Amino acid sequence: MIEFMDGLKRSHYCGELRVEHAGLEVVLTGWVQRRRDHGGLIFIDLRDRTGIVQVVFSPDLHEEAFLKAEAVRNEYVLAVRGTVRERPEGTANPNLATGQVEVLGCELRILNRAKTPPFYIEDGVDVDENLRLRYRYLDLRRPEMQEALIFRHRAAKSVRDFLDEHGFLEIETPMLTRSTPEGARDYLVPSRVNPGRFYALPQSPQLFKQILMVAGMDRYFQIARCFRDEDLRADRQPEFTQIDIEMSFVDVDDVLELTEGMVARLCREVAGLDIPRPFPRLSYREAMDRFGSDKPDTRFGMELKDISDIASGCGFKVFASAVAGGGQVKGINAAGCGSFSRKEIDDLTAFAAVYKAKGLAYFIVNEEGVKSAISKFFTEAELSAILERMDAKPGDLLLFVADKPEVVAASLGALRLHLGERLGLIPEGTYHFLWVVDFPLLEYNQEEGRYEAMHHPFTSPRETDIPLLESDPGRVRAKAYDLVLNGTEVGGGSIRIHRRDVQEKVFTAIGIDREEASEKFGFLLEAFEYGTPPHGGIALGFDRLVMLLAGKNTIRDVIAFPKTQSATDLMTMAPGPVAEEQLRELHIRTVLKIRERERLTAR
């Protein structure tokens, strides 16, 4: 029989009980982790979000409670009244925080029964992730999942406390806004009362937080929900959370210093990490040159080395032609990997090809010098210079790519990370934060034949570069910055444009004419005419930051109800079909249904 809690009020959480509670009568509530019969006694491990405690039922002391306990099964929901006592000598469980005590149950109420779960509710069980997502309410009962969400809560609280102490106001911005160009595709929401018109869910609160600066709010933050209808790459979510920050009357150093303080405090309070400050800074160009990435993992070496000057006059045409055509020749030193087999090197070549490298040249360094099919094309002086540049020693494997700078960076940067993981060069439990600064404002899209904003079109150019917007847009430098942790971008921001004339020049440079700018961003441009202060800010990816600090492998493990890589919710089966009547109210017809009807009619 299902019972109610009338008269029983929880006094303690299961995981709180210790030896000092011995002799105390307590009321506990929770789920049955397991039930065991031993020598006329029934032992129930009762679990709540704080932990597990053992409850003992004896027929000699409380027969009614004992009889109920016989009917209990895993995941039943119980309320128990009993007395805390030290466990008998030799029966303590060192694996439990409550392992020195147990509760002698005198009253038991079965508040709800449970079917047999499709997987064990405990850590360390190998369960298919789709099954976990289908039964997310069961998956979230597991201690490691509950700990992850508690960790996330504490991280959010740390951020809120820090920003509140530094004069920030938490202000909510609209979830229903208008669609704007640039960036990923918007999630669109049809307006019933405005037929044929659509809202968009925000990809970020960017424009609203800038307008809050125009409004004189001075310091704003929000732990904001954002939405992007993009093709999901590994470990992305269509809806995500970011720590959104904006400040008036600041420069780059002000934003970076405040962010470092917030992140360092979060790491200390939530993860117990002492992060040194200030964070190192790398220019965008230096990051690309040394690591082949604008989000470098600096926990290990194996940096890219440029040998273009040496290779330009060599007899190996692949190298010499690449340099002559404006390309580069760069390499990495896989120290100690000179024993790699030809197949292993071929596998590395195939890996680099994924990033458009046309080939992977290699030198195996030995005591005599270099073993390579291409060494004959180099003079002794050239080989010696290459070995010195690469800091090569006998037993090393040198890997080279000759191509356009972007291909060299992408392929060697990815190969560096691949080898770093494969060779165990990346230390566990270390956290390297750094800033990447001095980005170009724009990048050229070869396919569309136009410039695009590298970050977003509201990023301020350096004042000295503003004249270049009309004459040489590719040379304009941005007041932008990215925060990188262990090779993952966890945040990005900039000083913003606060003058209408500069904003219009940037729009023109990226192919947005005055008419389109007025239609899409007229409200922002008009706001800039009413006394806009200089301002800047940053947005940190909260899901990813929590994942990295919690030591998880995927952001899905720090989000309560994540979507799959195909943007579906396996628990609710969203997205799903809607009734024709709902579509009519929204003045929408689905093309798929029309096409199906046409196909059937054509038969």
Curated annotation (Swiss-Prot):
Principal location listed in the UniProt entry: cytoplasm
Residues that bind L-aspartate: E182, R228, H455, R496
Entry's Gene Ontology BP terms: aspartyl-tRNA aminoacylation
Region (Aspartate): 206-209
CDD domains referenced in this protein's UniProt entry, alphabetically: AspRS_core, EcAspRS_like_N
Alphabetized UniProt keyword annotations: Aminoacyl-tRNA synthetase, ATP-binding, Cytoplasm, Ligase, Nucleotide-binding, Protein biosynthesis
Keyword flag Nucleotide-binding: yes
Subcellular location, record wording: Cytoplasm
GO terms under cellular component: cytoplasm
Catalysis: reaction(s): tRNA(Asx) + L-aspartate + ATP = L-aspartyl-tRNA(Asx) + AMP + diphosphate
Residues holding ATP: R228, D229, E230, Q237, E489, G541, F542, D543, R544
Entries under HAMAP family matching the protein: Asp_tRNA_synth_type1
Family that this chain belongs to: Belongs to the class-II aminoacyl-tRNA synthetase family. Type 1 subfamily.
Name of the featured protein: Aspartate--tRNA(Asp/Asn) ligase
